[in-house]
Design a protein with these regions (language model features):
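Active-site beta->alpha loop and helix N-cap motifs at the rims of alpha/beta catalytic domains
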Residues: 1-139
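Catalytic alpha/beta core domains of metabolic enzymes, predominantly
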Residues: 117-126, 132-184
Length: 184
């Protein structure tokens, strides 16, 4: 799925007109889906309110006619839960969870336990994780990914940010219905 970028006005507020034009262009070219709030959208720099506005902008402009993938990143566990609720309310097709990035020195165990605690809030929405060890220094090994896959029937996606050589090796270890999207 193409991902929308965050654009800003001179006063540093979101340029919703330009972002809406971006969404319309993606729809016009016949994309099979659209994503938002990933690293390209500068999600870590946005406020909760701005993230909510972008989720609603996507939903309102896609009219639920093309799948939407919403990346969730917050400053606290509670903020993650609230953003998941916003994404679900706006009928996100997929929810992609980023690790809690308070520090780049998060162990794999802490990252895994965070996802394990958070995934139940996604309920029946397809959920995945942003697994970008090479890029952001935080992520899960294939062993932990498979553990999540076996534990949650809706855990069916990974958003990678790795080289094609690295991601090819990872994909070979996963079941066919665990979708892997990669891009940088």
């Amino acid at each position: 799925f193409p991902i929308i970028y965050s654009f800003f006005n001179k006063n540093n507020s979101l340029d919703l007109k330009l972002m809406k034009e971006q969404i319309q262009l993606i729809k016009k070219i016949g994309s099979n889906g659209i994503a938002c709030l990933g690293l390209a959208t500068e999600v870590q720099k946005l406020s909760f309110k701005e993230k909510k506005v972008i989720i609603e902008l996507i939903a309102n402009n896609c009219n639920y006619k093309i799948p939407t993938a919403i990346t969730i990143q917050g400053n606290t566990f509670d903020e993650y839960v609230k953003l998941i609720e916003v994404a679900r309310f706006n009928q996100a097709s997929w929810i992609i969870l980023q690790p809690l990035l308070k520090t780049k020195h998060i162990s794999e165990t802490v990252c895994y336990n965070f996802y394990k605690k958070l995934i139940p809030f996604t309920k029946d929405t397809i959920v995945g994780v942003q697994n970008a060890i090479e890029y952001i220094g935080v992520g899960l090994t294939p062993k932990k990914i498979l553990k999540l896959y076996k534990s949650f029937p809706n855990f069916r996606a990974i958003k990678g940010e790795a080289s094609s050589v690295f991601i090819e090796k990872e994909i070979s270890r996963y079941p066919k219905n665990l979708h892997v999207f990669n891009g940088r």
